[in-house]
UniProtKB/Swiss-Prot annotation:
It is found in: Cytoplasm. Belongs to the methyltransferase superfamily. RNA methyltransferase RsmG family. The lineage of its organism: Bacteria, Pseudomonadati, Pseudomonadota, Alphaproteobacteria, Candidatus Pelagibacterales. Gene3D superfamilies: Vaccinia Virus protein VP39. Keywords: Cytoplasm, Methyltransferase, rRNA processing, S-adenosyl-L-methionine, Transferase. Disulfide bonds: none annotated. InterPro entries: rRNA_ssu_MeTfrase_G, SAM-dependent_MTases_sf. It comes from Pelagibacter ubique (strain HTCC1062). The keyword S-adenosyl-L-methionine applies. This is Ribosomal RNA small subunit methyltransferase G.
Length: 213
C-alpha cells in the first residue's frame, strides 16, 4: 500500500482518493507552520500522527452528510479550517462546484484560511465576521465543530438563516445528556452516527429546527 494511504487508516473504507490525502498532508504542513506563530490548535494535537486523526479524519468523516448538490456549504466557526477546509479539499477532488463559506472573526485565523485556500486552489469564501451578527443567510449544509453548545448553535441557525438543508454538529462525551436536555426546548429531526475517531463522540445530522413554545 502506498505510504499516503497508510497515513490515514481510518479512511480506508471511505474511498478517499490519493489526491485528497496528499492535499490533507499539505494542509497539515501549513497548519503546523502557522501554529508556531499563533495558537490555532493545541501543541499536543499538532504532531503528525495525532493531527491526522484528531482533526483531519474527524472532520472528513462528515462528508456523507454534506449536501453536495448545494451551491453553498457553511462552516459557522471555522477556526483553523476544521471542518471547512477539509470538506472543501474533498469536494474539489470530487469535481464538485459548491463553495464553502468559512466564518471566522479572528484576523489571524482568517488570513491563514485565505492563504490555504489560495495555495490549494479551494473554492471558499472567508467571512471575517461574527456570524451571530450576520443576517438572512442561505446555505445548503451548515457545519459546526468545537464551536458553541448545541442550544446556541440551534438558536443561531433558527434566527440567522433564511434557508438551509441540514446542520451537522460534532458531539463530545457528554453529547447524549446535552441532546436530551436540548430536546426539552427544541424540536428537530436528527440522525446520529458514531464517530470513527472517538469512542465517546458522535455526529448529529439535524433538519427542520423548530423552537418549542
Amino acid at each position: 500500500m502506498e505510504e499516503i494511504f497508510k497515513n490515514y487508516p481510518l479512511l480506508k473504507n471511505q474511498n478517499v482518493p490519493r489526491e485528497t490525502l496528499i492535499e490533507f498532508d499539505l494542509f497539515i504542513s501549513m497548519l503546523q507552520e502557522e501554529n508556531e506563530k499563533i495558537n490555532i490548535i493545541s501543541k499536543e494535537t499538532a504532531k503528525n500522527e495525532v493531527i491526522r486523526e484528531r482533526h483531519i479524519v474527524d472532520s472528513a468523516q462528515i462528508i456523507e452528510f454534506v449536501d453536495l448538490n448545494s451551491n453553498i456549504i457553511t462552516d459557522i466557526g471555522s477556526g483553523g479550517g476544521m471542518p471547512g477546509i477539509i470538506i472543501s479539499i474533498m469536494i474539489k477532488n470530487q469535481k464538485n462546484l459548491a463553495k464553502v463559506h468559512l466564518y471566522e472573526k479572528s484576523h489571524h485565523k482568517s488570513s491563514f484560511l485565505r492563504k490555504v485556500s489560495r495555495d490549494l486552489k479551494l473554492n471558499t469564501e472567508v467571512m471575517q465576521e461574527n456570524i451571530f451578527e450576520a443576517e438572512k443567510l442561505d446555505s445548503g449544509t451548515i457545519m459546526a465543530r468545537a464551536f458553541k453548545p448545541l442550544p446556541i448553535i440551534l438558536d443561531l441557525v433558527y434566527k440567522n438563516f433564511n434557508s438551509y438543508k441540514n446542520l451537522i454538529v460534532f458531539m463530545g462525551k457528554n453529547g447524549e445528556k446535552v441532546l436530551e436536555e436540548t430536546l426539552m426546548n427544541w424540536d428537530f429531526d436528527f440522525e446520529k452516527k458514531k464517530s470513527i475517531t472517538s469512542e465517546d463522540s458522535f455526529l448529529l445530522n439535524i433538519k427542520k429546527i423548530k423552537k418549542k413554545n
